[in-house]
Amino acid sequence: LGITPRAPLDLMGGYEWYRIEAVGKPESTSFTAAVAALDHFITEAVTAYPVDPQRLFLLGFSQGSIMSCAFTLTQPARVAGVIAQSGYLPLKSGLKIDEAGLKGKPFILTHGVFDSMIPIQAGQAARDGLTHLGAEVEYHEFPMGHSVTDESLAVIAAWLKKQLAF
């Protein structure tokens, strides 16, 4: 079962989860509201479609990736793991991190070497930060920009299949 929330804020014909002050720096009020909205969405989804938290994975691209990480940093027991594509770890956003709950929590991170929106260094820092927090991290870089490719999706699919094979 795949359920995808739409980000709440309008952005030039698309949507965003929160406003940005600078690259890697979410605007505090909208970021806090976005994390609360995602929390509410997950609560409603699990009520409507009873899902075992041990089989619930969050997947996101760009801001969706950042939101998936933010939620899991604060409430790791509510999800099985995270698939984060082309994002960063919002450690400086004022989140109260549940370090004990992150121990062994599986994450897969993918990032484009040529990403001009969120530099590759942000992906590498996310990998290092999650590893430091005790998460189980698989990290892949691909010859792409700020995008998703068949190659990156194949790696993600293989990882997810492995995670669900218990």
Predicted segment positions?
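Short aromatic-enriched loop/helix-cap "lid" or pocket-rim segments at secondary-structure transitions
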Residues: 13-17, 95-97, 151-154
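Short beta-strand/loop motif that positions the catalytic acidic residue
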Residues: 108-111, 115
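Alpha/beta-hydrolase active-site loop signature
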Residues: 7-11, 89, 146
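Primarily recognizes the serine-hydrolase "nucleophile elbow" in alpha/beta-hydrolase
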Residues: 54-102
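C-terminal catalytic histidine-bearing segment of alpha/beta-hydrolase fold enzymes
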Residues: 108, 121-166
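Serine-hydrolase catalytic machinery in alpha/beta-hydrolase-like enzymes
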Residues: 1-55
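Alpha/beta-hydrolase-fold catalytic nucleophile elbow
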Residues: 6, 59, 83-86, 110, ...
